[in-house]
Every structure is written in structure tokens, then in C-alpha cells.
Amino acid sequence: MKTALTIAGSDSSGGAGIQADIKTMTANGVFAMSAITALTAQNTTGVTGIFETTPEFLGQQIDAIFTDIRPDAVKIGMVSSAELIGVIAEKLRAYRAEHIVVDPVMVATSGSKLLRDDAVQALTEKLLPMAEVVTPNIPEAEILSGMTITDAAGMEAAAKVISEKYGCSVLCKGGHQINDADDLLWRNGSGKWFHGKRIANPNTHGTGCTLSSAIASNLAKGYDLDTSVERAKAYISGCLSAMLDLGHGSGPMNHMFALKGEFVGE
């Protein structure tokens, strides 16, 4: 069985973060492991508290994983400090980690920045050059490229800049801001559009975590990047189409929509 590691924060409500990652990896047929960067008290209406892991303990978690069950792919999500980013980069380099997917969680849904400037600098200098693919949304792509994005051509220009600057492939997510469910993959000097069907579901908590984890899962199984993105988009469409409706805010998706078996039924 192939294996995958998520390095990210914990979401107490189960819709995003490592909880979404573990569900996604399991649903996509790989054995999931986690190294937690922070504990959060949150639900579908917002975040009420954050308790950050120490750099030393994060390093211990990564050591414990790589010295026993080596991951075939690594997904990196929310990392809130330059110190934690430094530990992740150091450990992944030392263990020669493969198939690294970076979801650069930098901007909240409200538009406010989630990372201090020193953490953004550490992310761009230490993690992005190690990534096989980075998966920014529009606001994150604007920060990474230093450009303003208003249309598909802007997505292509920004993705090209990010790819050339950091030496990685870039999946620029259009979301609801540009082309609904259309995403652009820029790799090896050219772009490829992945067109998706717009699903009218207001419950989208954890979509970014889920997409990046699904990509990592498929890379772990040996699929190339194009196929991994295509399969990941199909998976997240299934999650959204299941129309799970929980909580009082933007609720979670049903990561296990395709789960079948004698223990699933009521």
C-alpha cells in the first residue's frame, strides 16, 4: 500500500486541515500519516483559537514518520511561522522526500493575510523550491507572483512567473474568482487548463486542503502530475456533489461519498 504524509494544522471540526487530508488520502487509496503544525479550535463559522506546535516537536513527528513508514508523497498545508517552515525544509531535505505538494495557505477567505512577512519569505525561499507542485488560489498567486490577476490570461502570466522563480510546477486555482471550477497547471514552460463543472454547493470548507491531498495521494500511487490533478479534481467534484449539509456556516464536504461496505450502512 502506498503512503502519504500531511504536514498541516488540525481542524477540530473535521472539515479542513489534517482531518480533511487524512480522509482524502484514505478515500484515494493510500495510507495516511500526519505531522501537526498547530492545533486549532474552529468550526464552520470561524477560528476561535490556535495553539502552535514547537519546532522541536514538529521535527520529532517528522523523524518518527520517516524512520519507520516512509511516505511516498508529502502534502504541506498551513504552517504559520518561519521557524516551523525551516524545520520542515530541513527534515524533508535530509530524508530526500519525494512528490512534495505545497498548498501555500497565506490568505484567509476574508482576504486578510495569515502569515507574517518572515514566514512568507521562509515559505518562498525554503519550501517552494522543494515542491513538485504548488497549489495557490488567486490571492496567494498574486502574492507569490507580485501581480494582479483579473482573468485567465493573468492566471497564466502569474503561474509562469511563480514556476520560473521557484522551479516548481504551479496549479493556479480559479475558484469562484475567475473561471468557477477551471484550474491552470503550469509546468515545463507551458500551461494546461483543467475545466470543471460548477457545483452550486455553499459548503466548501476544506476544498483547498482536499485538492492538494488528493493530488499527493495520486502522485504517491505513481500517476504523473497531469493525471494526478485530473483525478483530484474529479474526486473533489464528487465530494461537493454529495451535498453534505452540516454546521451553521460554510460546512464540510463528504470526503467518503464513495465509501461502500458492510460497516457503512446505518
Regions found by a protein language model. Name each.
Residues 117-191:
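Conserved phosphate/ATP/ADP-binding segment of small-molecule kinases
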Residues 7-13, 191-205:
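Short pre-catalytic strand/loop immediately N-terminal to key active-site residues, enriched for Gly-Thr
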Residues 29-33, 192, 218-232:
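Phosphate-handling active-site elements
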Residues 14-30:
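N-terminal basic/disordered segments at the start of proteins
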Residues 19, 142-143, 201-225:
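Short, small-residue alpha-helix embedded
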Residues 3-6, 26-109:
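Conserved N-terminal subdomain of the carbohydrate kinase-like
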Residues 52, 226-266:
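Charged C-terminal helix
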